[in-house]
Regions:
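N-terminal cap/lid segment of alpha/beta-hydrolase-fold proteins
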Residues: 21-56
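Cap/lid segment of the alpha/beta-hydrolase catalytic domain
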Residues: 69-81, 87, 97-123
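Alpha/beta-hydrolase active-site loop
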Residues: 116-139
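Alpha/beta-hydrolase fold nucleophile elbow
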Residues: 140-151
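The feature captures the conserved acid-bearing segment of alpha/beta-hydrolase catalytic domains
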Residues: 171, 177-237
Length: 378
């Protein structure tokens, strides 16, 4: 029996689900992680990542709110939207990225609110408010110069937060915001109705980014939300940028998306009296090093895991996990069936190869980067 177990172990090891190890804090971005208390009937702590420019401040503050991946929120990684982080650090902002209750290492349980999408956003916004209450008590925070940003479910959270009209928060930025609820009848209409309700109570302007090949929200869905929001008196400028890659939902996290959103955001920030231009003295925060991204190939469609060479069922399952990770990301494979992936900066390409090569005998090559396939047959 021991021999059989050892043989099985060897067979499994050749295709180990090799995810890159959890990242160390990036000292070049002054990255730290705090556990911020949220008071209530029971006090819970919210895992929050902080990035600050060097110096004592006070700095303008931006909160960046995360989305919701499929599956158990507790297994969701700590959100590190480094493209956005670098953009704001170069402009002198302190960047605060909270994980809401039930997500990652935050305590408490995720409260979905069933099919009541309006209530869902309000509950999420309550967690963000608790973090901002803590932040505004810190000497490094400029309480008069604050911005709320969010992507996907975080964008919806941002719109809900707008109803609080929190002192010092000058504007809202919504990247592909919403919450897809296929189990709920007419959930798209529910989003529009809730957006209109939020607008009635919100006094600050907002900037919205949506694309036409979004895997969560189609064109009619986001147009309906925007029409309801502005029709109810909300101030919302929509940037409808068309198609982006294989899924426009990934715009905010993709380096290729920066040229679409950064110029629009800079103009918007200046229009509401917030810092918008990068400072030359802070240029170091914008530098990204790492492997060059290979060119896209036509070997296979991104989501067609049946075409991936070498890997067994565990590798195909790992690839499905990889596809749910935020951009930037990379997936690597080897002829012996080994595989590995990594997401987030720094350099997910190198880290995915390193993860794969733990069992890949230095023969690993990249199969996919971000939202395209780069594999070439020999």
């Amino acid at each position: 029996m021991k021999t059989l177990a050892w043989v099985l172990l060897l067979l499994c090891t050749a295709a180990t689900p090799l995810r890159a190890a959890e990242l160390e804090l990036d000292s070049s971005l002054n990255e730290t992680v705090l556990m911020i208390p949220k008071q209530g009937l029971f006090t819970i702590k919210l895992e929050t990542t902080l990035y600050k420019p060097e110096g004592a401040g006070p700095f303008p503050v931006v909160i960046i709110n995360h989305g919701k991946a499929y599956g158990d929120p507790r297994f969701q990684d700590r959100y590190r939207p480094l493209s956005g982080v670098r953009y704001f650090l170069q402009r002198g902002y302190a960047v605060v990225v909270p994980m809401r209750q039930g997500f990652s290492k935050s305590e408490g349980s995720y409260i979905g609110g069933g099919c009541n999408i309006e209530s869902n956003g309000e509950v999420q916004a309550g967690d963000v408010k608790a973090v901002l209450d803590y932040v505004t008590a810190q000497p490094w925070a400029d309480r008069e110069q604050m911005l709320m940003v969010g992507q996907s479910h975080g964008g919806w959270t941002t719109l809900a937060f707008g109803t609080l009209n929190y002192p010092g928060v000058k504007a809202l930025v919504n990247f592909a915001g919403g919450l897809r609820q296929d189990q709920c009848t007419a959930w798209e209409r529910g989003l529009a109705i809730a957006a209109g309700s939020y607008a009635k109570a919100t006094r600050v302007p907002s900037l919205w980014f949506y694309g036409d090949n979004d895997s969560f929200f189609n064109t009619s869905t986001y147009q309906g939300m925007h029409a309801a929001y502005t029709g109810a008196g909300g101030q919302a400028r929509l940037v409808a940028f068309g198609k982006f890659g294989s899924d426009s939902h990934s715009l905010f996290g993709a380096r290729a998306g920066e040229k679409i959103w950064q110029g629009e955001l800079t103009t918007f920030l200046k229009s509401v009296g917030l810092p918008g231009e990068a400072q030359s003295a802070l240029a170091k925060y914008g530098k990204v090093s790492g492997m060059a991204v290979p060119e896209k190939t036509e070997f296979a469609a991104l989501k067609d895991d049946s075409r991936i060479p070498f890997v067994r069922d565990t590798g195909r399952a790992g690839y499905k996990l990889y596809l749910n990770k935020p951009i930037p990301r990379a997936f690597a494979i080897a002829p012996n069936g080994a595989w590995g992936y990594a997401d987030g900066d720094p350099d997910p390409l190198k880290r995915s190869l390193d993860a794969c090569n733990r069992n890949g005998k230095a023969q690993c090559k990249l199969y996919s980067v971000d939202d395209f396939v780069v594999w070439k047959e020999d």
